[in-house]
Amino acid sequence: MIQTESRLEVADNTGAREVLCIKVLGGSKRRYAGIGDIIKVSVKEATPRGRVKKGEIYNAVVVRTAKGVRRQDGSLIKFDGNAAVLLNNKLEPIGTRIFGPVTRELRSERFMKIVSLAPEVL
């Protein structure tokens, strides 16, 4: 469960290490974002020769949360931390690699590219 001011690790090779959620997209009164939701983020920590720089604003999709996601069969999948993948303005991933597992809930039309790049789909 991600809200404004939440810090997330970045699960791709864009060069960003940590981002800060500055807005949950999808309605004026929307407070929380879960797995598969799009948020607006600011880069707080970046590698020196990365594709993105500190202070830049991007869209991102949440791929892992510590809160987890409940499946239809009653099972619950949780992760150790919160992670996101940076997106461009067309909502396509900026990076060319994804690190760590992602969940099956991302298998919508919009995020099939992320699912195909991920090393493991839970």
Swiss-Prot record:
SUPFAM superfamilies linked: Ribosomal protein L14
GO annotation terms (biological process): translation
CC annotations in GO: cytosolic large ribosomal subunit
UniProt keyword list: Ribonucleoprotein, Ribosomal protein, RNA-binding, rRNA-binding
InterPro entries: Ribosomal_uL14, Ribosomal_uL14_bac-type, Ribosomal_uL14_CS, Ribosomal_uL14_sf
Tree of life domain: Bacteria
UniProt entry tagged with the keyword Repeat: no
Signal peptide segment: none
Gene Ontology MF terms: large ribosomal subunit rRNA binding; structural constituent of ribosome
Entries under Pfam families matching the protein: Ribosomal_L14
Subunit comment: Part of the 50S ribosomal subunit. Forms a cluster with proteins L3 and L19. In the 70S ribosome, L14 and L19 interact and together make contacts with the 16S rRNA in bridges B5 and B8.
Functional summary from the UniProt entry: Binds to 23S rRNA. Forms part of two intersubunit bridges in the 70S ribosome.
Family according to the record: Belongs to the universal ribosomal protein uL14 family.
NCBIfam families documented for this protein: rplN_bact
Record protein name field: Large ribosomal subunit protein uL14
Lineage: Bacteria, Pseudomonadati, Pseudomonadota, Betaproteobacteria, Burkholderiales
